């Protein structure tokens, strides 16, 4: 039996979706373009860099999550007129939520471990400049495998548990009934986010401290690193707040709706904001993505990734 809330204004809820559509669709196309550059047209440049190899995985999971948001997840939240029919459809075709929901969570869960490795990567660049490339090249396959498998350590209970429709706003979200009561995804996420946040702060503090001691201080690189750190950290802190509510204080339905919004803000901040920050701060990537003077940039980029004295990996 449908539990759709008909008290919500169809027009207002639809406008909420289209307001997000305005930046999510360009975000999807933007991430797709970045992946084409890194994995396709300029793969000989970027895949030589352990940093961009790892960061491209972040672009991939962001692309997946934003695509699902704009084509599925936020449609059944912000289109009250579709709620009844869509909810019945998903209850009949139960395999759809059983596949889409874990897949969506997989994408965002992977981001925390990816950003941990990115922070460690940047720190090792300045701490071990002569060994940096060799160490990461030697262990890159292991790092990628770990990143791909890590989300399952958090999501296994979601995968095996029964899914149901949780009606919020004028629509609904997909949730799950824990088959293993103690294995809460929100609690797992809190641990993961706290770890990522801690690693980001510690490694970037070490990186900035080391850079400040260089004979020729790279003030612009230091400033860029601070901006990137602040942006990424704010995204995980906001998500941490939402997960803390879901893990320990979930009860008041109105508050649940507020924290769903907070969670979406954190998703969008990381998924849409991260590539914008990188494009803004990395001249080489910006030139390749927007086809600005590509020829001269190729030679500079190649030397960038092989010159131990160049700190461009920290964001130029």
UniProtKB/Swiss-Prot annotation:
InterPro entries attached to this UniProt entry: 7TM_GPCR_serpentine_rcpt_Srg, Nematode_SR-like
Membrane topology: Multi-pass membrane protein
Main location: membrane
Keyword Disulfide bond: no
Molecular-function GO term, any one: transmembrane signaling receptor activity
Pfam families: Srg (PF02118)
GO cellular component, one term: membrane
Highest taxon of the lineage: Eukaryota
GO biological process, one term: sensory perception of chemical stimulus
Locations listed in the record: Membrane
Segments traversing the membrane: 21-41, 50-70, 99-121, 140-160, 188-208, 229-249, 258-278
Keywords: Membrane, Transmembrane, Transmembrane helix
Family from the record: Belongs to the nematode receptor-like protein srg family.
PANTHER family noted in UniProt: SERPENTINE RECEPTOR CLASS GAMMA-1-RELATED, SERPENTINE RECEPTOR CLASS GAMMA-RELATED
Protein name: Serpentine receptor class gamma-4
Organism: Caenorhabditis elegans
Lineage summary: Eukaryota, Metazoa, Ecdysozoa, Nematoda, Chromadorea
Gene: srg-4
């Amino acid at each position: 039996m449908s539990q759709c809330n008909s008290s919500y204004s169809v027009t207002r809820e639809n406008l909420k979706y289209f307001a997000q559509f305005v930046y999510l669709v360009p975000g999807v196309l933007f991430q797709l373009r970045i992946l084409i550059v890194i994995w396709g047209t300029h793969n000989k440049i970027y895949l030589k860099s352990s940093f961009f190899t790892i960061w491209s995985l972040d672009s991939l999971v962001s692309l997946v999550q934003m695509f699902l948001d704009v084509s599925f997840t936020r449609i059944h939240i912000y289109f009250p007129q579709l709620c009844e029919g869509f909810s019945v459809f998903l209850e009949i075709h139960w395999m759809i939520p059983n596949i889409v929901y874990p897949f969506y969570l997989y994408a965002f869960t992977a981001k925390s471990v990816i950003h941990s490795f990115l922070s460690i990567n940047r720190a090792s660049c300045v701490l071990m400049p002569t060994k940096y490339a060799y160490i990461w090249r030697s262990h890159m396959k292991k790092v990628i495998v770990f990143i791909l498998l890590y989300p399952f350590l958090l999501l296994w209970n979601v995968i095996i548990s029964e899914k149901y429709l949780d009606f919020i706003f004028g629509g609904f979200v997909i949730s799950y009934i824990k088959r293993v009561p103690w294995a809460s995804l929100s609690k797992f996420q809190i641990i993961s986010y706290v770890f990522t946040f801690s690693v980001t702060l510690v490694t970037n503090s070490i990186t900035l401290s080391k850079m400040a001691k260089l004979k020729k201080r790279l003030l612009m690189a230091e400033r860029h690193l601070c901006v990137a750190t602040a942006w990424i950290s704010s995204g995980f802190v906001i998500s941490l707040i939402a997960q803390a509510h879901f893990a320990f204080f979930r009860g008041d339905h109105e508050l649940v709706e507020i924290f769903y919004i907070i969670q979406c803000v954190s998703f969008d901040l990381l998924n849409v904001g991260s590539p914008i920050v990188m494009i803004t701060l990395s001249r080489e990537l910006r030139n390749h993505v927007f086809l600005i003077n590509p020829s001269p940039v190729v030679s500079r980029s190649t030397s960038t990734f092989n010159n131990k004295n160049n700190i461009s990996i920290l964001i130029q």
